[in-house]
Amino acid sequence: MANCFGEEVDIFKLDTMSRYVGKEKKREDLAREASRLSNEDGKNDKATKYVRDLKAWYGKGVTTLCLIYNQTGDTLRYVDTVDWFGYIGQTPYPTEIGNGQWASFLHVKRSGVSSGSMAGIVYRGKDKDGRERDFMLGWSSPWGAFYRNKAYCEVGNVGSFSSRWDDLYRLVSNADYTWNAKDNGRSSVHASIGVPSSSLFIAYVETPFGP
């Protein structure tokens, strides 16, 4: 995908590292190296520049500059989304985010409407034990100086978010600048958003790993 940045951290990449040569590679190992290499070759910087360039092209108006980093040890695949306010900008949500890749996209307000950018997106991946899990990420960049930005995230069973959008709207609306979600030590998500209007929303989808 054009809006995914970085070389995928896969088994072939681990084979080039002395720590893993001749050894069995586990999902935990892939997650560890994805975490360690989060800005390899400046990929985080490139993803950030990309979404800032999208914002510059879009111009004035409330937006959310979204970055997602995959350090689960497996591929994240797009499942579903909802736009409570606004819509996806010039580039689409990536259908897949490889392990060790940054996804970068812009969510924008509707022109001529006194509302901001507020949406939720679901990606599907695997946890530490190889079970499929759904990861929900939500953000709110309101229109108007009297409202605060919000970041939210959850880990759930496959398909568990599709019937909960009304509930998730309430949860995102009452979230904070940072949010953490854990799944019994098998997976986790961390999401954050800046304070100013049109801030970066940054989410890390993670599989836990040892030293």
Feature roles, as predicted:
Residues 1-211:
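Intrinsically disordered, low-complexity segments enriched in small/polar residues
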